[in-house]
């Protein structure tokens, strides 16, 4: 698995481009500088299989609309953050504009897509979704959407030739998630866990007690797990258990 980190925006967000032999990439947290992300994709001959968001804060998603316009791949964001991520509540930091919302259709990401023109599969969410009266319509137009993750647990995901688990780690925001590539011993922790620190909880939706439980969950990952946080340097779970007060205390 290949990983290219691009540090973007005034708040120096670590945007990650991840790909395997299939040359179909996952873009994690396109916070700013869409042209720089595009340059990495072009240099490595990559298409975009999906855009993964660790949480909804503006500094992590402000290049989303521009990137998605060029690469209309599915976008994944937890339901708890999708509620406010594209509203005035998300002018955090305040000098960032309100993130532009790509065309959104709330779907269940655990269901596989069906080809355009084929009938829905009875008994799945390709029939009306959770009483919302929406149908999973996988036409080209419907691919411009945000796939809302809700209750994802730690079920294995496979996108292109990449296998990973999505870990719910609320606290910094209600919908924070981490992307754990178990076979590669890599976890993208967003703003939940940093080298030597953890995410702040004084912003709207933050909760220190809930974050403590999320940190405990991450502390139980294999010690050799490489940590790529939303800001700052890389680390490992082993190093953080030895040196990070916030992880040690939980």
Model-derived regions: residue spans:
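Metallo-beta-lactamase
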Residues: 90-95, 113-117, 124-127, 131-144, ...
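Active-site HxH/HxHxD metal-binding segment of metal-dependent hydrolases
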Residues: 33-36, 40-128, 134-157, 242-246
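Short acidic-hydrophobic surface loop/beta-edge motif
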Residues: 6, 18, 153-159
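Conserved beta-strand hairpin/beta-sheet module of binuclear metal-dependent hydrolase folds
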Residues: 1-44, 179-190
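Short catalytic-loop micro-motif centered on adjacent basic/acidic residues
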Residues: 26-28, 50-52, 166-168
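Residue-level marker for buried hydrophobic side chains located in beta-strands
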Residues: 26, 52, 75, 188, ...
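Short, hydrophobic/aromatic-rich segments at coil-to-beta transitions
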Residues: 1-5, 154, 163-165
């Amino acid at each position: 698995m290949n990983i290219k980190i691009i540090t973007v925006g005034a708040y120096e967000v670590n945007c990650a481009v991840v790909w395997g032999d299939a040359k179909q990439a996952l873009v994690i947290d396109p916070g700013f500088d869409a042209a720089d992300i595009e340059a990495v994709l072009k240099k490595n001959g990559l298409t975009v299989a999906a855009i993964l968001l660790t949480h909804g804060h503006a500094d992590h998603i402000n290049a989303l609309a521009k990137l998605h316009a060029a690469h209309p791949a599915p976008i994944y964001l937890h339901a708890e953050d999708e509620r406010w991520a594209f509203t005035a509540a998300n002018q955090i930091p305040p000098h960032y504009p309100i993130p532009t919302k790509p065309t959104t259709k709330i779907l269940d990401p655990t269901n596989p897509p069906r080809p355009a023109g084929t009938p829905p599969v009875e008994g799945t969410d390709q029939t009306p979704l959770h009483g919302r009266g929406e149908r999973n319509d996988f036409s080209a137009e419907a691919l411009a959407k945000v796939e809302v993750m809700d209750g994802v647990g730690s079920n294995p995901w496979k996108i292109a030739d990449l296998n990973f688990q999505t870990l719910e780690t609320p606290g910094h925001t209600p919908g924070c998630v981490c992307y754990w590539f178990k076979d590669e011993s890599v976890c993208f922790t967003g703003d939940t866990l940093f080298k030597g620190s953890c995410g702040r909880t004084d912003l709207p939706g933050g909760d220190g007690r809930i974050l403590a439980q999320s940190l405990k969950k991450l502390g139980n990952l294999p010690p050799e797990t490489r940590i790529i946080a939303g800001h700052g340097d890389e680390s490992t779970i082993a190093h953080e258990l030895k040196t990070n007060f916030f992880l040690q205390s939980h």
